[in-house]
Amino acid sequence: MGRGTGHDQYELAATSEGGRKKKRDKKKKDMDDLKKEVDLDDHKLTLDELHRKYGTDLTRGLTSSRAAEILARDGPNALTPPPTTPEWVKFCRQLFGGFSMLLWIGAILCFLAYGIQAASEDEPANDNLYLGVVLSAVVIITGCFSYYQEAKSSRIMDSFKNLVPQQALVIRDGEKKCINAEEVVAGDLVEVKGGDRIPADLRVASAQGCKVDNSSLTGESEPQTRSPDFSNENPLETRNIAFFSTNCVEGTARGVVINTGDRTVMGRIATLASSLEVGRTPISIEIEHFIHIITGVAVFLGVSFFILSLILGYAWLEAVIFLIGIIVANVPEGLLATVTVCLTLTAKRMAKKNCLVKNLEAVETLGSTSTICSDKTGTLTQNRMTVAHMWFDNQIHEADTTENQSGTSFDRSSATWAALARIAGLCNRAVFLAEQSNVPILKRDVAGDASESALLKCIELCCGSVNDMRDKHVKIAEIPFNSTNKYQLSIHKNANSEESKHLLVMKGAPERILDRCSTIMIHGKEQPLDDEMKDAFQNAYVELGGLGERVLGFCHYFLPDDQFAEGFQFDTEEVNFPTENLCFIGLMSMIDPPRAAVLDAVGKCRSPGIKVIMVTGDHPITAKAIAKGVGIISEGNETVEDIAARLNIPINEVNPRDAKACVVHGGELKDLTPEQLDDILKHHTEIVFARTSPQQKLIIVEGCQRQGAIVAVTGDGVNDSPALKKADIGVAMGIAGSDVSKQAADMILLDDNFASIVTGVEEGRLIFDNLKKSIAYTLTSNIPEITPFLLFIIANIPLPLGTVTILCIDLGTDMVPAISLAYEAAESDIMKRQPRNPRTDKLVNERLISIAYGQIGMMQATAGFFTYFVILAENGFLPSTLLGIRVKWDDKYVNDLEDSYGQQWTYEQRKIVEYTCHTSFFASIVIVQWADLIICKTRRNSIIQQGMKNKILIFGLFEETALAAFLSYCPGMDVALRMYPLKPSWWFCAFPYSLLIFLYDEARRFILRRNPDGWVERETYY
């Protein structure tokens, strides 16, 4: 990526003439390029070599004419927006994708059938026309609803644009100029100061106390020092490179631009995130599988009966009408709306629990998740450095790191602690922002870096106001922290009259501080710093460092009054005061502590077999300590390094398979082949990836997906966006998350709490179970809707159930009950189950079809036919008379058709009886659907065990009954929908069948519970 001539642009488009294969190969190559580690060598160059490579004078910068040439060659310093999907295409996908397509085909077939009838008959029935119109309306309404739900999604590049700084200070022709950041070119000499955003990737040429916040890029929460020194082979870790769009927190720096726009590290991440192919959600794959089943059944039945009707001597036009009728009757019209509404309801329920779902289908994906790759900072941890331990009086004391200060407290009476607290408060530039007196100390905003803020809050909590302490000890002189000295020093007036007038306080890297000390304070008394005390210090330092904590050393010195009288001029440039032979006081160590709820949440993920992997940009020791703290590495599980240390043998002699846990450094990951990565993911149950780059996060996600896992990724930085986009479900943080990560994600945790993910998994699993129940309920009524049509063709009887009445069931009485199943409570502890295997555990499987169609559906059809035959018999047509009567029955010109008793019936009278039969068949289906709804509440438990607590479902039972009664008895329905009033006794014909369905299924589930894995479970447990 270092660019003398500057043409290694990462554009992801290819020219058309190369043909599609070339384009695909190029795209794959581009993607592979982007996934590679950042390949920079500019950090290794000396300033002379840098001058030769970019032609930049390190005092005068580029000439304006040269800058214009480079701008013309490389283009503006801006990120290229990715090709976006137009809104109309998104809308069309909702209208014509998946399930909608099936309904459209149904609608077209209806219009076709109506067309054939209109061409061949004088007065065609309008049923097929109505059906076609209703089907089209259903698709359009649900399509608009889904589009509206998802319209708020995926604006990735817009937020990347927000990251681009507006202005930049460059030096051209020896003059400082403030120009638009888009005009910055490679080779420009740029100046940045605290508060600025870095305008491009810079090679630092000079710096004064410069620190940058790389957290959005690398995930490191601490500000990083920037200086001209080459400190690391890895360009992401070296001190002399500052990255585009990170923030300069303090100090100033001057540097040469080495990359602009898409060629910057951030540009590569942006291109990578926006050009990733996103896979389909598990639920959309399930729905497609379901459509294949339904379509298969419909076409098989349709074609079979088409051939049969031709054999039975029907005209081919009639046979085509039958074919279309059967195919359409198989389409569950209400199901599309049911699924959409169920997912929306769950999304709303999750929003109340702080999970905001951007993409409806992601609701279920989270339930199928088998691996969670979680970022550390801010997700598993509180994202605030906190003092965790102190070492003074030769003893380690534990501080309280809990969010609500409910943890341990230590002995604060020691004089050494008072001295330590005084240094931590005075040798500290952090201050609380104004007007926060009523805010709890831990929640207050602080101006200053993370470590100093932690010390400030700790001292404020333990010792009262730090401001008062600073007022009493006025600061006279200060040497700020720098990377060469590795300490910070300040001199204060001492208000305590028993001590000398001036107090020197110092903090910094523990080993550097100890080197400057000759005495140590123990229990308030100074004593010589002997080897024994040095060993004690070393042990404490190693122990705290091993906990992944950032350790600082503290010392002080009372400047003698005879040499440093009041008014003495302290010179911090030519130091005129002692900085050796000081008195060592103690250590304080800080960590970004785990969130309180995370340990429990990780445990909850573990019990159903969800693997939790930590992926972080932080140091391996810190990462491992937090992983142990939150249970990602569980107690007693060792890494290869732990085993080697325990057995006292070299690491390479340990068999990696013996270690259940594993900490992989980004540097090692870079050199692993995909096979080696697969091996790690397969054979270690507890994994931590530390010091990872954005590209590596993506490679880890792809590795998990190769194992067949459904992967959820949590993250908050820009660096997480490619992984969030690639994952089956990306989960971003709502509070700390960058805009970019929120746009790339499918779900946002509004409270940034990992524990909310567990709630999401639970809801996702529940919706999958409940969708199964809803589909089982909806499909069952398909059989009593299709069989009347089949008998109409085969047995030549008057039509028992009309098209309009079928619509009244699918889009009327069945809708509310089907949706009410989305509110059903979980049957058992769904968080104890293993994650769903997408290959074997389908939303709709053969067993569900067998129960819905073959068993319950057949009983329902029998109930309908029983009522149909009862009504016709009461009107004089016994079953034996009905066979073969259809042609005469439907003939308008036959007005003297005799029944079983010799009575003659006109066409009008016959049709009134037929439509009354349609209405009663419809009412019977409603009554048997009562039982079906109740048995669909549970797949394994008894109804008595499950209870009838679902209020929406009880409402659904009353609603469908009331609707059926309304359609039957409302005046005018005979004209509008051809539905006629029923005698009260006819409602009761279906009751025995309803009871039979209930008892049959209770018995089936009883056997299922008594004989787990038995024949009944294998054949009927859906």
Curated annotation (Swiss-Prot):
Question: Which residues belong to the propeptide?
Answer: 1-5
One biological-process term from Gene Ontology? intracellular sodium ion homeostasis
Sorted alphabetically, which PANTHER family does this protein's record hold?
Answer: SODIUM/POTASSIUM-TRANSPORTING ATPASE SUBUNIT ALPHA, SODIUM_POTASSIUM-TRANSPORTING ATPASE SUBUNIT ALPHA
Reactions it catalyzes = K(+)(out) + Na(+)(in) + ATP + H2O = K(+)(in) + Na(+)(out) + ADP + phosphate + H(+)
Please list every transmembrane segment annotated in the UniProt record, as residue ranges: 87-107, 131-151, 288-307, 320-337, 772-791, 802-822, 843-865, 918-937, 951-969, 985-1005
Region annotation (Disordered) ranges = 1-34, 213-234
Q: Where are the stretches annotated Interaction with phosphoinositide-3 kinase?
A: 81-83
| Residues involved in ATP binding | K486
Taken from the UniProt entry, a GO cellular component term is: plasma membrane
Which SUPFAM superfamilies does the record cross-reference, listed alphabetically? Answer: Calcium ATPase, transduction domain A, Calcium ATPase, transmembrane domain M, HAD-like, Metal cation-transporting ATPase, ATP-binding domain N
Q: Where is the composition biased (Basic and acidic residues)?
A: 1-10
Subcellular compartments:
Cell membrane, Sarcolemma
Q: What is this protein called?
A: Sodium/potassium-transporting ATPase subunit alpha-1
One Gene Ontology MF term: metal ion binding
Record text on subunit structure and interactions: The sodium/potassium-transporting ATPase is composed of a catalytic alpha subunit, an auxiliary non-catalytic beta subunit and an additional regulatory subunit.
Q: Which residues form the active site?
A: D375 (4-aspartylphosphate intermediate)
Provide the membrane-side ranges marked Cytoplasmic in the record. Answer: 6-86, 152-287, 338-771, 823-842, 938-950, 1006-1022
Give the record's family classification.
Belongs to the cation transport ATPase (P-type) (TC 3.A.3) family. Type IIC subfamily.
